[in-house]
Amino acid sequence: MTRFLFAIILGFLLTACQQVTVEETEYVPHKLTELRVGTLYGPQIYMTSGQGNSGFDYDMAVLFAEYLDVPLKMVPYTNRAELYDALKKNEIDIIAAGMTETPARREQFRLGPPLYRVNQVLVYREGMPTPKDITDLKGKITVIADSSFVETLTQLQKRHPTLVWDQVTDKDSEELLAMIANKEIDYTIADSSSVQINRRYLPDLRSGLVLEEKLDVVWLLPPTHSDGLMSQLLAFWHQEKLAGTLDHLNEKYFGHVKRFDYIDTRAFLRAIETVLPRYRQLFETHAGDLDWRKLAATSYQESHWNPNARSPTGVRGMMMLTQPTAKEIGITNRLDAEESIRGGAAYLRDMINRLPESIPESQRMWFALASYNIGYAHVEDARKLAESMELNPNAWRDLKKVLPLLQKRKYYQKTRYGYARGSEAVHYVDSIRRYYDTLVWVDNQSKQQNSDEEEPSDLASEDGPAPVPGTLSPDKPK
């Protein structure tokens, strides 16, 4: 009997000591059927126009979607708080909006690898006193709410308790920069890349104090359940880094805007208003399959749209053609604006067609312009030199490094065609790219204005507020 009771008690105790397994519901990440990318509008982030979509973040998002083998869905927002909220609620998969790495963002989200670097700078307008430090301001600072600029000012306020600023939720960085130029606000803070891009259209912008240096621009991922997507993003980033994609996009969006000439930019904007209307139709007619604005930008670089222009070397006219070139393409009067534009377009098209097929379509124009400037043979010399230096002869970012070497005996004595002023060719192409970007911006602003004027006024009251002037996307932002 005692043994029987002992066995029962022992069995009960063993049963009580067994581990109880509680079945928990695990989070199963959804398989991506499309890549939903939350973003903000901006020339270096995401823009849409009649020529298609563009932007550093957009181009990378396209490649990432291709890497994942899913369709891309860009979801633009106009408010950072709503953008952050959408990521936390799983309404989007990732934020790609030119955002820098900050302590606050590290706490809230997972951060992707660095895409490029920027400085945070204080921005004011031409004619205002140059501030010596953040306490030496003759007016108010206005910044975007929920931005990294608020974090920077908050840290500065700890050392300078009298520092105050205004925050706005209904403006983006471009609008604040325009308000600086239009004397509507005194100061703002912006990323250096934004200032460099926007001063092509707003030449009165000045950047003063550097408040933060070398900040990494990153993508933001959800704080939880994003291990798989993060692993894929890191693998994709490593692949594109090795392929030179990041360097290519950096050069594409920022390589030509670092140089800035205040007087030249103002003169160009005036010429767009006063001179271009006389010749625009000719550029559009004779551009053919070229973008007429690239042809017009080339002509401005050559002659400032002066049909009687002449250089000491004998080139003349709107497109500054040499006598042999004019004869070759059937131009009899280089001083006739239409003949010169027609001839310049034909010559430029010929340069493009002569280039090797290995040069990507997106970069062929820059190679052709360099050929237009110093000759096709010297560009071929530079390509061969690039190859010998283990650089990519089909990438403009690498050719920019090599072309100036054609002025050094150490290098040009090894080439077939010898010495060439390669650094001038680089400057020439960069200038045309800046003029072209400005023409695109002005053209799009004009189209948007015309569209707003043609739209019936009662539609605005039925459908909500009218779009912000300058918004170029047909997508309705959230």
From Swiss-Prot:
Region (Non-LT domain): 23-257
Active site: E302
Protein name as annotated: Membrane-bound lytic murein transglycosylase F
Compositional bias (Acidic residues): 451-461
Topology of the protein relative to the lipid bilayer: Peripheral membrane protein
Designated gene of the protein: mltF
Cellular component aspect of the GO annotation: cell outer membrane
EC number: 4.2.2.n1
Function: Murein-degrading enzyme that degrades murein glycan strands and insoluble, high-molecular weight murein sacculi, with the concomitant formation of a 1,6-anhydromuramoyl product. Lytic transglycosylases (LTs) play an integral role in the metabolism of the peptidoglycan (PG) sacculus. Their lytic action creates space within the PG sacculus to allow for its expansion as well as for the insertion of various structures such as secretion systems and flagella.
